[in-house]
A protein has these predicted regions:
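Periplasmic binding protein-like
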Residues: 68
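Exported/periplasmic ABC-transporter solute-binding proteins
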Residues: 17-55, 59-63, 71-84, 90-97, ...
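Sec-dependent signal peptide recognition
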Residues: 1-8
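Hydrophobic h-region of N-terminal signal peptides that target proteins for export
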Residues: 8-17
Length: 247
């Protein structure tokens, strides 16, 4: 597979280097950066990406902002296709991610191994951080699905420290919150924070992220090559190494 990709990328490089622009949600930032950097080295093309929570990203798209590629949760794709924003057939599923929890580095690790244990941890926590439900997919899921299932929505909301962007683990690292919840890929590698683990399986509904070429892309062929690379065995390995599971 590596030989095949190298040959394809040499063809792309021969056609002249492109500068691709990518509009993406933050959940894929680490994995995408690693994989696209490797692709850039092999192809000679440049990739410039911006990362936002899903809500603000949708707002940018609605306002008319465009790039060569958009990466967003798959539940947004029906609307993107209906509105003629993405190129039909260009979508590539990149990976799925589950919800996890993090605490300040050095703090005791709370028990989140079962639904009852998680309820106890939430009840005992003085402050809880998760993404603003209006801005991030993980925050919306935590607020509208997980907390109601636990019967603790109002109780947790009363002591919530909502994240506006980036990683909610930054709030536990700074001491603003005692425990943080988000897609595990966004909790990883935050200085001063430690990932506790994943939430119980019965509370999970992994979010699948996918990319597609946007209509009006300046470099549609190169954009599709990048997406194909991300979905290949080489690209998939990078996503798996960064906490994703296969879509």
């Amino acid at each position: 597979m590596r030989v095949m990709w190298s040959a394809a990328l040499m063809v792309a490089f021969g056609a002249g280097a492109a500068d691709l622009t990518v509009m993406s949600t933050g959940a894929v930032k680490a994995a995408f950066t690693d994989a696209s950097t490797q692709w850039s080295k092999e192809s000679g093309n440049k990739v410039t990406a911006t990362f936002d929570p899903a809500g603000p990203l949708r707002q940018k798209i609605a306002s008319g902002m465009r790039g060569d590629i958009v990466i967003i949760p798959v539940d947004s794709f029906a609307a993107l296709e209906k509105d003629g924003i993405i190129v039909p057939g260009s979508r590539r599923d990149l990976g799925a991610v589950s919800m996890g929890a993090a605490v300040k580095e050095g703090a005791p690790l709370p028990d989140i191994s079962s639904v009852e244990a998680l309820k106890g941890t939430l009840r005992n926590a003085k402050s809880v951080s998760y993404m603003d439900p209006e801005r991030g997919s993980s925050g919306k899921y935590f607020d509208t699905v997980i907390l109601p299932k636990l019967g603790m929505r109002e109780e947790v909301r009363a002591k919530a420290k909502l994240g506006e962007g980036g990683s909610t683990a930054e709030k536990v690292a700074s001491g603003e919150a005692e425990i943080a919840f988000q897609n595990v890929t966004e909790l990883m590698n935050v200085k001063g924070a430690r990932v506790v683990g994943l939430l119980p399986a019965e509370l999970q509904s992994p979010i699948v992220y996918a990319g597609a070429v946007m209509k009006g892309a300046k470099h549609p062929a190169e954009a599709q090559r990048l997406l194909d690379y991300l979905a290949s065995s080489q690209g998939r390995k990078v996503f798996l190494d960064r906490g994703f599971t296969a879509p």
